[in-house]
A protein has these predicted regions:
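N-terminal ordered "arm"
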Residues: 2-65
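Acidic-enriched, low-complexity/disordered segments with a strong bias for Aspartate over Glutamate
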Residues: 7, 12-15, 34, 46-50, ...
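A sequence-level detector of short, solvent-exposed, charge-rich linear segments
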Residues: 42-46, 70, 123
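Hydrophobic/aromatic-rich structural module bridging two neighboring secondary-structure elements via a short loop
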Residues: 51-91
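Surface-exposed beta-loop interaction hotspot
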Residues: 79-161
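Ser/Thr- (and often Asn-) enriched beta-sheet segments in non-cytosolic proteins
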Residues: 163-165
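Conserved small/polar residues in nucleotide/adenosyl-binding loops
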Residues: 172-174
């Protein structure tokens, strides 16, 4: 349910049943990388919300929580959500402030229609993610790492007649 905030401004809300700690970790990391990060909320089912967050790497990261959002597709400040999640123990309704839909960079990935091409061992993904983080630290200046390094394919998976190339920027753990 959307509610009127100070001076009659309509604000967005997110009611979380479970999954708050994982969401808190993701959003806190995203804000640490980009204080102006945005969050977009998609009501996947009656009680499941996909929460997407922007990153400075042109990759959108996400977490799924049990909950209900005031408006499907609402975009809010990641910093505001992070602050609300710090104050909230595990479940409850969060006041996310005013919508900022215009700040979202593009379309979300489709909610359905995916198929598993292959499964990667978590140790491989973790090792690549750690190397990606080391790479970003090496280029900690305002320009960051060269996009050619971030866009470089680090894993190629094949299966069911499909080939998928995964670039480094998709594996950087935020």
């Amino acid at each position: 349910m959307r509610k009127a905030g100070p001076e009659g401004m309509v604000t967005e809300t997110l009611e979380i049943g479970s999954g708050g700690p994982g969401l808190r970790a993701l959003v806190t990391r995203a804000v640490g990388l980009d204080s102006g990060a945005s969050v977009r909320l998609r009501q996947l089912t009656d009680d499941v919300v996909d929460v997407f967050v922007t990153t400075p790497f042109e990759v959108v990261a996400s977490r799924r929580v049990q909950g209900v959002v005031s408006r499907d597709g609402a975009v809010v400040s990641a910093a505001t959500l992070a602050e609300q999640l710090k104050e909230q123990e595990s479940s409850g309704t969060l006041d996310l402030g005013p919508a900022r839909d215009a700040s979202w960079p593009g379309a979300l990935p489709p909610a359905t229609g995916y198929s598993v091409v292959d499964t990667l061992p978590v140790t491989v993904v973790r090792e690549l993610s750690d190397k990606g983080q080391q790479l970003t630290r090496q280029f900690s200046g305002p320009m960051g790492p060269p996009s050619s390094l971030l866009n470089q394919t680090v894993v190629t998976v094949e299966g069911e007649g499909a080939t998928v190339e995964i670039p480094m920027l998709s594996l950087i753990h935020i």
